């Protein structure tokens, strides 16, 4: 019996040892570039090191409390946000630097950040926040400039329908067919039947 306990103790020690991260755990696009891959492997190995931080916790807590729904913030939450923000900044900077190197420049520019955001599905949530680089629109005739919905001076750029990668188009339709769901009660279908059919044509 004592021998079994010894084996269990050995197994527990082995289970507590972190395995190096596999490539499947890395963020998208990180495995294609050696610099990004090495950065994320290093971050995953040192993810428990929250003592050294660059961003002020008081400022992060103030931003969190700006939301009217947030009443209290635990002491650990700003620390985790600080680490996440640092990782976000470094990753986006690396991706932007790669864009600067592609253009044979040694200075990081706003256009490099815009290009890094536009070329990464990870950062597509920033497309409305980061101004688009005007040179992208002139270099790629597929881009269509649309006025900003808020009336701002910076236009948004979109590819015409059928050009954007994603769900394939079927036939001449705009979207792939979706599954038909039964109608819910009170959605107006009963009214159409009472009026003699589909509600519009005879």
From Swiss-Prot:
This is Nuclear transcription factor Y subunit C-6. It is found in: Nucleus. The keyword Cytoplasm does not apply. Residues 1-29, 180-202 are annotated as: Disordered. It comes from Arabidopsis thaliana (Mouse-ear cress). It comes from the Eukaryota. Stimulates the transcription of various genes by recognizing and binding to a CCAAT motif in promoters. Expressed in flowers and siliques. Residues 17-29 have a biased composition (Polar residues).
């Amino acid at each position: 019996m004592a021998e079994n306990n010894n084996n269990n103790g050995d197994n527990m020690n082995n289970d507590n040892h972190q395995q190096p991260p596999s490539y499947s755990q890395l963020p998208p696009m990180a495995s294609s570039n050696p610099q990004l891959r090495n950065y994320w492997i290093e971050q995953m190995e040192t993810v428990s090191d929250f003592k050294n931080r660059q961003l002020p916790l008081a400022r992060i807590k103030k931003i969190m409390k700006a939301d009217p729904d947030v009443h209290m913030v635990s002491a650990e939450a700003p620390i985790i946000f600080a680490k996440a923000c640092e990782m976000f900044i470094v990753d986006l900077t690396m991706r932007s630097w790669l864009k600067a190197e592609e253009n044979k420049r040694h200075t990081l520019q706003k256009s490099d950040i815009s290009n890094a955001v536009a070329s990464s599905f990870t950062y597509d949530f920033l497309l409305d926040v980061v101004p688009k680089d005007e040179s992208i629109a002139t270099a790629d005739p597929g881009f269509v400039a649309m006025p900003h919905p808020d009336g701002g001076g910076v236009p948004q750029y979109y590819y015409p329908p059928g050009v954007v990668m994603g769900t394939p188009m079927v036939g001449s339709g705009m979207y792939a067919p979706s599954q038909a769901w039964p109608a819910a009660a009170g959605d107006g279908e009963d009214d159409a039947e009472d009026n003699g059919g589909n509600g519009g044509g005879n």
